[in-house]
Amino acid sequence: MKFTIQNDILTKNLKKITRVLVKNISFPILENILIQVEDGTLSLTTTNLEIELISKIEIITKYIPGKTTISGRKILNICRTLSEKSKIKMQLKNKKMYISSENSNYILSTLSADTFPNHQNFDYISKFDISSNILKEMIEKTEFSMGKQDVRYYLNGMLLEKKDKFLRSVATDGYRLAISYTQLKKDINFFSIIIPNKAVMELLKLLNTQPQLLNILIGSNSIRIYTKNLIFTTQLIEGEYPDYKSVLFKEKKNPIITNSILLKKSLLRVAILAHEKFCGIEIKIENGKFKVLSDNQEEETAEDLFEIDYFGEKIEISINVYYLLDVINNIKSENIALFLNKSKSSIQIEAENNSSNAYVVMLLKR
C-alpha cells in the first residue's frame, strides 16, 4: 500500500472519526484506524464495536492498493504537528507504516486489517432519504429528554419511528418527553428503532455541516447513514419503547399563551433560589397574572410576576424549573402554548402555531 495526501485533508477527516476510538487492553485493535486504498479512494474506518465511522477521500495521485491498521491517536497527533499544506506520504513495508512529510519521518507499528471488526455487509429492512438539516433539527429538539444511565436501558436512547408517512423522533427519561416529526416525501416500510444516547450525540456532531441529502438504511439491529463523504453505522438498543402516545394530550383545551422570552427571563430569575436538589418552582396563574415562585433549603425565597392574556380558571402547579427551561430553549417561537391535563399531573408545551414539536413534563407534587 502506498499513497500521498495533503495534510489538512487527512487531518480534517481523522478528527471526524477518531472521537469513537477507545483504549482497550483486551482488544487493542479498537485503538487503531483501518486504512484501505482501492479504486482511487482512501477509506479510514474507526469503531468501538457500537459505533462505526468510515471517511472516504478521493486520491488524485498515483497509489498502490492495500489495507492495514495503525494507531488512530498517533497518526492524528503526527498530522497535527505538521504544516497544514504539506504532503504526507504513507507506505506499508514489512508490516510497518512509513510516514514522511517534508523533513519529518515516522515508522509506525501495524495490526492486520483482517482482524479489524467492521460492518461490511448491511442488510436493511427500510431505507429513505432526508435532508441533513431536517434530521439535525429533529434530534436537537428531542435529545435533551433522553435518559442517561437509567436501569430501564431502552430510555437511554432516542426512538426513531416511521408511521403513517411521518418520521418521528421521541425521547423520554420518565419525567419528561419530547417529540418531533416531519412528513416524508415518499412512503417507506414501517420501522421503529431505538438509537443509543452516545450514538445520537455523535450523529449530531457529524450533522453540524452544510445541508446535504442523507441516505438512511434501517437494519434489524443497526442503522446506517450515508453523508457526502462519511458513513455512520451504530448498533441499536433492543427492547420495546414506552407508549409515548399515551402521554401526549388527546384533548388540548384552554391554552395558556405566553411570550417565550418573558417566561424564560422570569424562570431564570427565580431559579437562582430554587432548591438545589429538587429544582422545583411554583407557578400561579390568575386574572391575567403569571407568577413564578421558588424557595430552598435555606428558607430563601424568590418571586417574579408578569402579565399574560389569560382570565380562565385559577392554576397552581409545581414543576422542575430546568426541565421547563430546556423546553423553552428548544422552541423557536415568539409565543408558546401551555396545556394542563385534567388530573393536573403533567403539562404539554408547544409553539403557539406549530405542533410539529411537543413536550410533556411531569408536575411535582405540591
From Swiss-Prot:
Key word Metal-binding present in the record?
no
- Gene Ontology molecular function terms on file: 3'-5' exonuclease activity; DNA binding; DNA-directed DNA polymerase activity
The domain of life is Bacteria
Subcellular location(s) of the protein: Cytoplasm
Which UniProt keyword terms apply here? Cytoplasm, DNA replication, DNA-binding, DNA-directed DNA polymerase, Nucleotidyltransferase, Transferase
Query: InterPro entries of this UniProt entry?
Result: DNA_clamp_sf, DNA_polIII_beta, DNA_polIII_beta_C, DNA_polIII_beta_cen, DNA_polIII_beta_N
Which BP terms in the Gene Ontology apply to this protein?
A: DNA strand elongation involved in DNA replication
Q: Which GO terms describe its cellular component?
A: cytoplasm; DNA polymerase III complex
Question: Per its database record, what is this protein's job?
Answer: Confers DNA tethering and processivity to DNA polymerases and other proteins. Acts as a clamp, forming a ring around DNA (a reaction catalyzed by the clamp-loading complex) which diffuses in an ATP-independent manner freely and bidirectionally along dsDNA. Initially characterized for its ability to contact the catalytic subunit of DNA polymerase III (Pol III), a complex, multichain enzyme responsible for most of the replicative synthesis in bacteria; Pol III exhibits 3'-5' exonuclease proofreading activity.
What quaternary structure, including any partners, is listed in this protein's UniProt entry?
A: Forms a ring-shaped head-to-tail homodimer around DNA which binds and tethers DNA polymerases and other proteins to the DNA. The DNA replisome complex has a single clamp-loading complex (3 tau and 1 each of delta, delta', psi and chi subunits) which binds 3 Pol III cores (1 core on the leading strand and 2 on the lagging strand) each with a beta sliding clamp dimer. Additional proteins in the replisome are other copies of gamma, psi and chi, Ssb, DNA helicase and RNA primase.
Please name the NCBIfam families in this protein's record.
Answer: dnan (TIGR00663)
UniProt family annotation: Belongs to the beta sliding clamp family.
Name used for this protein in its record: Beta sliding clamp
